[in-house]
Amino acid sequence: LSRYSSLRYKALTARQKGARGLIVVSGPNSKVVQQLAPMTFDASLASSGIAAISVTDAVGDKLLAGTGKTLKELQDKLDNGDLMGGIDCKGTLAANIVIQQEKKKGRNVLAVLPYGAEPDPHVAPLIVGAHIDHLGSSGGSNSRAKGDEVNKIHHGADDNASGVGGVLEIAQWLADLKKQGKLTLKRDIIFAAWSGEELGLLGSNHFVEAYAKMIKGDANAKLTGMFAACLNMDMIGRFQKSLVLQGLGSSSLWAKEIEKRNAPIGLPITTQNDAHLPTDSTAFYLKGIPTLNAFTGSHADYHMPSDTADKIDYQNAAKITKLMGLIARGIATADAAPDYITMEAPKNS
């Protein structure tokens, strides 16, 4: 659950639910050295309209005054697994926030396998993608490392060299089939390595917003029907008990398609309906595009320098890549694209 506990995921969830601001408090059970969060935050929120502040436990308890509850009581319940909804806090909170932006350039890397001699913009293409960025030589605020470990190289073998490797293998396989005359595509396939995922889905969001701006004149416009689907791979290298396929609720096609394509492979699979995820597929789903994300689960090395290549389960990563490749081939050779189903984000998520 560590990837869902990050401030980034919580902020993205709050923003999707229409929050105007986010107040972060550590809580008395957290036993942190400093109660205030570091003065760095998600780059994707720079122009989102959501403000974020960190407060001490004492201030947090003052905000709860009048509700009959304390931070300690609430955190005890959460620590014990008790789910709860929101708490109505009366009053108004005012804060002066100064943001210092540091701008850098990131690059998405895309390639197209056209179904004809040239790419055809009139037929909805399939997207097969994975994020290419990680945390670098010092993990920053997204690192889970402590002490001197923070300044070590964060290799990102599973997160997400494994996913990028899968995209490259699928691209090579399908391109070879087409070259040999063994593949009759009905639509183009776009292979994408997204930048800035760890900073808040920056690369994939830029792509869909720029595309919407170019085609419809509005970066916020929906793109339903403009792309057949988005297949995403984020952390597929540390197979545990089963492969997790997320976003099945985004299309009625996925369940049968997965069962059909997995038959010759035999991977144990766990499915999740929700398409609101802390990964690049969400950028496409929110634009009206059906999505499917492959994920083998979090682990103790997540966002740590210890996420290294020697720990990758290459045999099962290859099986997962084969499955996603077969699904990609099925969509790219079908006359009709998968349908899109609108889902609300889960409550209390």
Regions from the language model: what does each represent?
Residues 17-22, 89, 122-126, 185-189, ...:
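Loop/turn elements at helix/coil->beta-strand transitions in domains of secreted/extracellular proteins
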Residues 3-5, 9, 13, 30, ...:
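Acidic/histidine-rich catalytic neighborhood of metal-dependent amide-processing enzymes
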Residues 15-17, 46, 86-87, 102-105, ...:
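Extracellular/periplasmic catalytic domains that process cell-envelope and extracellular macromolecules
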Residues 15-20, 24-27, 60, 64-79, ...:
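Sec-exported extracytoplasmic/periplasmic mature domains
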Residues 49-73, 194-299, 313-317:
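Metal-dependent peptidase/peptidase-like ectodomains
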Residues 1-51, 114-115, 122-125, 134, ...:
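Extracellular/luminal Protease-associated
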